[in-house]
C-alpha cells in the first residue's frame, strides 16, 4: 500500500524510505549557533581597569548587561526625539550629550559628558 507524505501526495514504500533517510541525514548536521550580542567583554575590561583583583559572577554580568542595554536604548531614544524636534535627520554627538544631560542626574551627567567628550576627542585625533 502506498504511503502518504507530509505534503499529502502518495509515494511508494521505496520512495518513502528514501524521503525519511534524507530528512534524518539533515538532522544529523550541527546547526550554527545563533549569535547573542552582549556587552560582557567590555564590562569585564572596565572592571579590570577599576578593580584588577575583582571578579564578577554570571548573574551580576547579566544584570550589568541589561543595565547597559537599557541605558543605551534610553539615550538613543531621547537623542532621536531631540533630532526629530529640531527637524534634523542625523543624530550627532550634540544630541547624545543633551540626551545624557536630560536622562542622568546632576553629578553623574557631568561625569558622563566629560568622559564622552574625552572619548570623542581621542577618536577624532586618532583619525
UniProtKB/Swiss-Prot annotation:
Residue numbers carrying N6-acetyllysine: 7, 13-14, 17-18, 22, 25, 87
Cross-link (Glycyl lysine isopeptide (Lys-Gly) (interchain with G-Cter in SUMO2)): 7, 22
SUPFAM superfamilies: Histone-fold
Post-translational modification as stated in the protein's UniProt record: Monoubiquitination at Lys-36 by the MSL1/MSL2 dimer is required for histone H3 'Lys-4' (H3K4me) and 'Lys-79' (H3K79me) methylation and transcription activation at specific gene loci, such as HOXA9 and MEIS1 loci. Similarly, monoubiquitination of Lys-122 (H2BK120Ub) by the RNF20/40 complex gives a specific tag for epigenetic transcriptional activation and is also prerequisite for histone H3 'Lys-4' and 'Lys-79' methylation. It also functions cooperatively with the FACT dimer to stimulate elongation by RNA polymerase II. Crotonylation (Kcr) is specifically present in male germ cells and marks testis-specific genes in post-meiotic cells, including X-linked genes that escape sex chromosome inactivation in haploid cells. Crotonylation marks active promoters and enhancers and confers resistance to transcriptional repressors. It is also associated with post-meiotically activated genes on autosomes.
Modified residues (Dimethylated arginine): 81
Phosphoserine found at: 38
Function: Variant histone specifically required to direct the transformation of dissociating nucleosomes to protamine in male germ cells. Entirely replaces classical histone H2B prior nucleosome to protamine transition and probably acts as a nucleosome dissociating factor that creates a more dynamic chromatin, facilitating the large-scale exchange of histones. Core component of nucleosome. Nucleosomes wrap and compact DNA into chromatin, limiting DNA accessibility to the cellular machineries which require DNA as a template.
UniProt similarity note: Belongs to the histone H2B family.
The protein's name in its UniProt record: Histone H2B type 1-A
Organism, as annotated: Rattus norvegicus (Rat)
